[in-house]
């Protein structure tokens, strides 16, 4: 299993700033979230966020890191694929060095949890734009991408559908099995329980070898939580935190 930690991003949920002494909020004033716009306006803002990310050094570096993680994962899986191919087909398959990432990535799935309300939250919109750029960079078809957030509005569901990704209708609570397919789980700042559920659902050497997580640092979770709490409430994270392979950015 590989993981890339998105430490620089803040949580999607807007935080309240401390008000200056004696200052009263103006009528209608709230968190930094924007009023939700119509679908066309949301798409326009999303395209603007994509363009901003394209010229960002952070985005470029992060995409290169993720691409390299995915390439290494697919290369490690290739010997098993070759062995199975020989068993069933009686002939060898192209080696990892012969097969480009784009060809291998066409078999990769992407599952996104916890994106946030991107129609009104700029941070969530940036996270969605980054996911779309990741799919483009690694040439993972959008039809191989599933997304879910319990807070999605109907406008956001319509926008995501128009982008070519599938919006899940049920809350899986992170309990999705990779079912033998390399799968990237894009989980920008999800709760610790979802990561634990994901590991539980794929708790075998074969399944974990096909999991790549873009999200919070497991080592960071380990440092922030008491060992007893981690062991009792999130045992699968505790088991892999010192064995996981993957950089932060």
Swiss-Prot record:
Induction: Up-regulated by hemin and 5-aminolevulinic acid. The keyword Transmembrane helix does not apply. Residues 26-40 have a biased composition (Basic and acidic residues). It holds the Pfam family SRR1. GO terms for biological process: heme biosynthetic process; regulation of circadian rhythm; regulation of heme biosynthetic process; rhythmic process. InterPro entries: SRR1-like, SRR1L. Keywords: Biological rhythms, Cytoplasm, Heme biosynthesis. It is found in: Cytoplasm. Residues 1-40 are annotated as: Disordered. Residues 14-25 have a biased composition (Basic residues). Plays a role in the regulation of heme biosynthesis and in the regulation of the expression of core clock genes. PANTHER family: SRR1-LIKE PROTEIN. Belongs to the SRR1 family. This is SRR1-like protein. It comes from Mus musculus (Mouse).
